[in-house]
Amino acid sequence: MTTREQGTLRTEVTERDHQIGPADAPITLVEYGDLQCPHCRRAHGVLPRVIRRLGDRLRFVFRHFPITESHPNALRAAEAAESVAAQAGEQAFWKMHDLLYEHQPEWEDADDDTRILELAKEAGANPDTVAADLESDRYEEHVKEDFMSGVRSGVNGTPTFFINGRRFDGDWTTVDSFVAALEEAAS
């Protein structure tokens, strides 16, 4: 794979993806994230303000990229988020996404799914159904598809961002710097 290809999003955004914002927005931001990653949690603190500032000019897409070697509960969290989405819809997915990041220290080192299931209930899902889905690995393949789409795009860490299909390795740590990069991509 050439350097140019590694900097390109190889899997197009589809209805399968979790998205906020209009499909025809001039800016599409795709994040490959790990729900247990502390850097992704930091990005989560910036992204809602970026989304608010850009409004309908931005479509934000989240794809799972659990790095289980470093974050052993990341896959479980991603599968739980998918179970919540299947049960309660896209808004519930985003609530679960937010809750998992906001409460990350409470579940990241847990030996069981108790706290993740409590968060699933808070997000609007039936925790017994989420538990059964986790037990059967019902959404593992979905999460792995996200992961492999990241691998094909050259993702090797999280968070990794793509702006309008091009990898963004700039400063995402402040709202102003991230918005400036996004607006530049749209011009």
Give short role names for the model-derived ranges.
Residues 1-11, 184-187:
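N-terminal targeting signals for export/organelle localization
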Residues 32-33, 44-51, 117-187:
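C-terminal cap of thioredoxin/glutaredoxin-like
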Residues 8, 13-15, 102, 129, ...:
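Residue-level signal for pocket-adjacent positions within structured domains
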Residues 10-27:
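A short beta-strand-turn-helix
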Residues 7-8, 38, 138-139:
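Short, flexible loop segments at the rims of nucleotide/cofactor-binding pockets, characterized by
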Residues 19-20, 107, 168:
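Short clusters of hydrophobic/aromatic residues that line enzyme substrate/ligand-binding pockets
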Residues 30, 35-36, 41-121:
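Structural alpha/beta surface segment adjacent to cysteine/selenocysteine redox centers
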